[in-house]
Amino acid sequence: MQKQAKTVQRKSMTTNGAFAFASKMVAMIVPFIVYPFIMRVLGAESYGKVTYAESLVSYFALLSTLGIESYAQRECSVMRDNPDGLRKVASRIFALCLIMTTLSFVSYLAIVLFIPAMQSERPLFLIFSLWIIGSGMSMGWLYTAQERFDISSVREIVAKVLYLVLCFTFLKNSNSYFIFGIIVVFTGTVFTMLWNVSGIIRGQCGIVPSLKYSSGFSECIKPIFFLALLTIGSKLFTDFDILMIKWFSSTDSDRAVGLYNSAILLPRALDGILMTVSSVITPRLFIATRQRQEKEVCTLMNKTSNVLFFISVPAILTCWFFSEEMIGLFAGDDFLDAAPVLQIYSLIIIGVLVITLAGTRTYIARQKERKLFCILIVGAVLNITFNYFYIRMWGIVGAALATLSAYAIVMTIELTLEHTWHYIFTLDKLKYVMAGCVVAGIFAIVKYCFNFPSFLRIVVAIGVAGIFYVVVLYFVKESTLMHVIEKMKNAFKMK
């Protein structure tokens, strides 16, 4: 019997943001705990094999969700207060997910089974085929549309803890990379799919999609087609560097992939935190844009970007000044050649932040997918071209420079064409520049004037600089800090 559709009680943006931030903090802390162990046990070469398999399958997983995620979030957000209408829309999207996941899975298996170059690590590639199913059928878009960030956050925390426990339990030496691949696949997408689907069946999202209500799903194809092109362009623009390192590196390609990925893990973990926090505004951004509430859009963007700059500025400076120490502590001496990559890639954090907020999400909210696709294709072509030449000249450092160059160009084009510079770059941002200069000065003094061991050097620098960073922002009345202080005051008053 079909469960009756019902309206979901939603939490405030502050509460959702807190849940999202907590989950991503766990997602950032877990790598600090487990990756030093993983990289020392596996080594750069074995770690690079798993990284390459994950990067390759991600393109087929992309096929299974081509444009569906963004379209589903947008359409389900608009229909979320109409449970019956939401069930119909979600059912159509579910049917499309099922079709695309099947096509993607079969295509990937054909390549793995029949291309000779895949033979040496075929068992590993076959295990990663499950990634496609987990990604395509995870249905996370329904939780986002219903603003169930509490449930999503708990799921992500459980998955990360499970990942940590499994790695420490089963990884023994460099030959354990196949087991590591199984752990990555299960905790990465399969666990998410099982959690989400079981939760939806139990009514956590108010409705249960069903093929019974999926008639007319062909109506979704046209708008999703352009979002699919957009997703392809974005993937080629942001993630093609690892494959190109594997194909064009003049040194040991598996080792080069392992070195490069070890360096970008930290910046990408921070990107994940920032983008999860920013995703809290996505449903409301779509609604405000659809209703032409420009003032509300500006307010959402400004508040969110302030939070993101508050976090990202000291993080970028830490990666830049202490890249070698962080790589040494994080991955071991076998990975020290990746330190310059960490420095360069940390600068990309700002590009990701700006492009996601004032670029990609704004274009999708305004239904400018075609224009955004063209921009991302330009970025993808530039990124591939830069990588082709830079990797041959400078190896993994060249790959990082190529990605940074492409991000800078795409950011400039996106914000200029839609006139969205004012969403992000307000006078308030000078406060972070001011505080960042103080942090940079303290980092330089600690790094070059004191001969501390690596770990102590980082701890002292972050501790002292963190205090000065907060003090400076307090005196200039930075909005995020003032909001946190006000919340704390109110909490103490209630007690």
Go through each PLM region and give its residues.
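Signature of the first transmembrane helix
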Residues: Q9-E69, F105, L164, K222-F248, ...
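Interfacial/gating helices of multi-pass transporter permease domains
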Residues: Y35-A61, Y177-F178, G216-L227, I245-R268, ...
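Interhelical loop/hinge segments that connect adjacent transmembrane helices in multipass membrane
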Residues: M1-Q9, Y177-G181, W195-T238, R284-T299, ...
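Transmembrane helical elements of multi-pass membrane transporters/channels
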Residues: T15-P31, A159, F180-I200, S214-I287, ...
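Membrane-proximal transmembrane or re-entrant/amphipathic helices at the cytosolic face
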Residues: Q2-Q4, A444-K495
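Hydrophobic alpha-helical transmembrane segments
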Residues: S129, S153-G203, P223, V378-L382, ...
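Membrane-interface junctions at transmembrane-helix termini in multi-pass inner-membrane proteins
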Residues: R122, I132-R155, L347-V378
